[in-house]
């Protein structure tokens, strides 16, 4: 078939973009955002977080549940109320999630270096509003 020249050029530009920012800078930023989200979610009664306790072993993906609500309900509320997109369900890890006591799955927020503190604050505020 025809090679994807546009795809190759796009990949090259993406690599250049990341190199300019610096992978270490991206790692530091994502860790800061991840820690902020976890700290704020921990402060909400009924929210259970599934993440390594040591921040050095975390990545920018945080899984959590909200007591008394299905993950899909939480994801739909976040989308409807604040245009926040998260993943909900079993995340292709049914056996693991059942083993850790999440038979309905979890909500998974994915953070990237381009997210802002405001993005996290909006997500947390929306969850708080949902629980009122």
Language-model regions, residue ranges each:
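Pyridoxal 5′-phosphate
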Residues: 1-132
């Amino acid at each position: 078939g025809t090679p994807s020249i546009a795809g190759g050029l796009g990949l090259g530009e993406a690599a250049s973009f990341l190199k300019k920012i610096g992978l270490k800078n991206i790692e530091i930023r994502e860790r800061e955002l991840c820690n902020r989200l976890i700290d704020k979610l921990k402060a909400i009664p009924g929210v259970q977080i599934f993440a390594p306790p040591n921040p050095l072993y975390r990545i920018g993906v945080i899984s959590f549940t909200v007591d008394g609500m299905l993950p899909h309900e939480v994801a739909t509320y976040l989308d409807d109320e604040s245009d926040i997109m998260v993943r909900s369900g079993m995340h292709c890890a049914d056996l693991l999630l059942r083993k850790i006591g999440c038979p309905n799955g979890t909500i998974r927020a994915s953070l990237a270096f381009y997210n802002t503190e405001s993005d996290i604050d909006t997500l947390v505020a929306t969850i708080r509003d949902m629980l009122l």
